[in-house]
């Protein structure tokens, strides 16, 4: 089985400039997702999609491949779907493509591999990392703030509410297009909150 991990790590960031190469502990942020992908017992190839020379150097030093991202795919308005689709190499027939964000440095390779096993065993089109975060949240309708709950309850009594973490999106390769990585048969994979730090 051929499983490709793609790590999108562009140079620009509105929130934190050069965030992917900033040190977190002893290593640049992007190091952690590359390390997990390379250490996975299921991922066969790792590609970093970047327009950053420092990220390119880090990736190559670690043994990952680099896909140089064109300027038109490095802007703030570009969807991740288009970036991932652009980075998929055609030198192999891929079974799965995994998007791994550098902004989830606390994810463990054990959790990643368990999720891959679950996606394959369950024959899912897409598996998305998430945390269970049942909070008393509010939304907006017609300009008014309204509660997203019917009754105020303690957190442990609230129904599950899963929030995507961005740590990974595991997709069957044949459903990945320029506009989506989400198929019909979709599930979320609950990861520990400590592994969802962004």
What is the predicted role of each segment?
Residues 93, 194-197:
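Extended, histidine- and acidic-residue-enriched regions that form the cofactor-binding/catalytic faces
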Residues 100-102:
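Active-site acidic Asp-centered loop
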Residues 2-49:
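N-terminal glycine-rich phosphate-binding loop and ensuing alpha1 helix
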Residues 53-98, 107-114:
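Short phosphate-binding loop-to-helix
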Residues 49-50, 170:
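Short beta-strand scaffold positions
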Residues 82, 86, 105-192:
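Conserved core of the sugar-phosphate nucleotidyltransferase
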Residues 43, 92-94, 123-124:
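Short, high-confidence coil segments that cap the C-terminus of an alpha-helix
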């Amino acid at each position: 089985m051929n499983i490709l991990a793609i790590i999108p790590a562009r140079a620009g960031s509105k929130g934190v400039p050069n965030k992917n190469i900033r040190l977190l502990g002893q290593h640049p942020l992007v190091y952690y997702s590359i390390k997990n992908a390379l250490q996975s017992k299921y991922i066969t190839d790792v590609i970093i999609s970047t327009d950053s020379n420092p990220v390119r150097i880090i990736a190559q030093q670690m043994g990952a491949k680099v896909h140089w991202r064109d300027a038109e795919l490095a802007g703030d308005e570009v969807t991740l779907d288009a970036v991932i689709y652009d980075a998929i190499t055609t030198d192999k027939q891929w079974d799965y493509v995994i998007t791994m964000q550098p902004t989830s440095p606390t994810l463990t390779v054990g959790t990643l591999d368990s999720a891959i096993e679950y996606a394959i065993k369950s024959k899912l089109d897409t598996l998305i990392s998430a945390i269970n975060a049942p909070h008393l949240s509010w939304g907006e309708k017609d300009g008014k703030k309204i509660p997203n709950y019917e009754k105020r309850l303690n957190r442990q009594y609230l129904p599950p509410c899963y929030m995507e973490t961005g740590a990974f999106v595991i997709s069957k390769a044949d459903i990945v297009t320029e506009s989506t990585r989400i198929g019909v048969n979709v599930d979320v994979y609950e990861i520990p909150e400590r592994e969802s730090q962004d």
